[in-house]
Amino acid sequence: GDNFVPYRGTSVYLAYNSETVENPPKTAEELYQWIEEHPGRFTYNDPSTGNSGFSFVANTIYNQLPEEAATSSDEKWKTEHTEEWDNAFTLLEELHPYLYQTAGKVQYPMKNAGSLELLANKEVDMTPAFVNMVLSQKAMGTLPEEIKLTQLEEPFLGGLAGFMIPSIGKIKKQHCL
């Protein structure tokens, strides 16, 4: 179908422990520097298991490209800007050894909740996270009060969820939203 009904939109912010991080990064460059200066204290979830991890990776890539690339479908961003792509993946590789580790190896938590669990247990001090997850978990008491949110000057990609009803559905009235 051609119809999309949004039911939830949320943003990814930087969630951090205010007891251990007095001055959270304000820019992506400051974040990358913080990660290197605080080995093992930052994580993002496996991007294939949660969008907050995907958001960190995608933003790291887009931050190396011209601003227009983030909203353009022009093939030139794939073919004419290979140096910027290479720089982005090099940056991710450079950050890799400074991320959260367990058993002596970098470990990417599973799902958005996995990153927040590490933050709640004080195994990391900072992670990208969906605002609605942080706020609801703080309200339920599963995230401590010292967990705060901040947004970088280069905002993280968010997440929009919605419903689509295919036009081949059995109940024709429902696909006419």
Model feature map: region roles:
Residues V5-G9, I35-E37, A120-N121, G141-L143, ...:
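Extracellular/periplasmic catalytic domains that process cell-envelope and extracellular macromolecules
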Residues T10, L92-L95, L143-S167:
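Periplasmic-binding protein-like
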